[in-house]
Structure formats: structure tokens, C-alpha cells
Regions:
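Positions within the helices of HEAT/ARM-like alpha-solenoid repeats
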Residues: 25-32, 65-72, 85, 97-101, ...
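Alpha-solenoid helical repeat scaffolds
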Residues: 104, 131, 135, 162-166
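Second-shell loop/turn segments in exported
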Residues: 1-2, 74, 103
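Amphipathic alpha-helical scaffolding segments comprising HEAT/armadillo-like alpha-solenoid repeats
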Residues: 9-21, 43-62, 71, 80-94, ...
Length: 191
């Protein structure tokens, strides 16, 4: 694995380029190699190789034309990504296929809180983006997101509201008690 990891970004990109759509061939060998490289560079003893592997995974995600393979690459990126990768990952939050993978990578990456809060401050957020951000805020227990979450409740559809309530329950303060109590009362729950 050391030799593969030492090939850096270009090596990761070359292996990723060998991935084919599932209906056209088998990827187990290449997936195993990429998984092994990622596991190798996440070991503290080999951390110096991590940045190049991350860069290779990001480039491979951008170049790959098959969604299932891109999802696999995201699953590997989430093990070694850093806050520096957050903006590149956030570009996929509105992608119907890759949004969940991008979101999980953002949630599992330390230091992405500022980017997530900046995304929440945008004016043109879709319901899907609000749901994704609410999920991320809940997972990260990000108390600074509460004002956004409370604002999004007004006019939210049922699915978005549910995700917002989950986030408020996880990271809200006293300001969230009233809307959470009202939502609970609507469903017949008593406090």
C-alpha cells in the first residue's frame, strides 16, 4: 500500500479512472486498491501522504462520469477529507444522486462548520438543501445554526419541517422549546 499511496494524486486518479459502470465490468480490484490506499494514509504514521490522496479523490470525483463510482469515491473521501475540501464537497449537495454522499462527507469532516453556516445564510436555498443542512447541523450539534433553523420553519413543507425539528432538538436552545412544543402538540404528544 505504501507504494500505491506514494504515487499521490496522480496514482489515485489513475486507479479511479479504471473504474467502470457496474453493468460493464467488475470494480472490486480497483475499489480494494483505493480503499487500501485511503486506510493507509489515514494511519497517523503515513499522514504525510494524505493530502495528495485527498486531492486525487476530489479530482477523480470531478472527472468520473458514473454516479455509482462517484459515490464510492465520496465514501473514501469522507475518511481522509479536511475542512479545505468542504467547498468542493458542497458543490454536490443539490445533486440528486450524490447529495447524501457529499453530506455524509461534510458531516464527518472536522472543521466544516463555517462552510455549513455560510451555506445556510444563502437566500436561494431549496427545500432539499435546507433538509440537508438541517441534518448536518443536527449531526454536528451546531448551536450556531439555530437562528437559521427557526427562520426556515416558516412556510416549510412537512418533510423539511421534520428535519428542522430534529435539528432543533439536537442543537437548539431555549428559543427552540416553543416551536418544538407546538410541533409536538400537533402530533398529539404531551410534554
Amino acid at each position: 500500500m505504501g507504494e500505491l499511496a506514494a504515487t499521490g494524486s496522480k496514482g489515485v486518479e489513475m486507479i479511479a479512472a479504471m473504474l467502470v459502470p457496474a453493468d460493464k465490468g467488475k470494480n472490486a480490484t480497483f475499489e480494494y486498491a483505493l480503499n487500501g490506499v485511503v486506510a493507509y494514509v489515514t494511519d497517523p504514521a503515513h499522514e504525510a501522504l494524505r493530502d495528495d490522496v485527498r486531492k486525487g479523490l476530489l479530482a477523480a470525483i470531478d472527472r468520473c462520469g458514473d454516479d455509482a463510482n462517484r459515490a464510492f469515491l465520496f465514501s473514501q473521501l469522507q475518511f481522509c477529507s479536511t475542512a479545505a475540501d468542504a467547498a468542493a464537497m458542497a458543490r454536490y449537495l443539490d445533486d440528486p444522486y450524490l447529495a447524501d454522499y457529499a453530506l455524509r462527507a461534510l458531516v464527518s469532516t472536522p472543521g466544516t462548520e463555517a462552510l455549513l453556516l455560510a451555506e445556510a445564510g444563502k437566500d436561494d436555498l431549496t427545500a432539499a438543501r435546507k433538509q440537508a443542512l438541517a441534518y448536518a447541523f443536527a449531526e454536528k450539534r451546531l448551536a450556531a445554526a439555530e437562528p437559521f433553523l427557526l427562520t426556515w420553519l416558516e412556510g416549510a413543507d412537512a418533510q423539511t419541517a421534520e428535519q428542522i425539528y430534529n435539528a432543533l432538538a439536537a442543537c437548539g436552545s431555549q428559543a427552540s422549546v416553543k416551536p418544538l412544543a407546538a410541533a409536538a402538540a400537533k402530533t398529539g404528544c404531551a410534554w
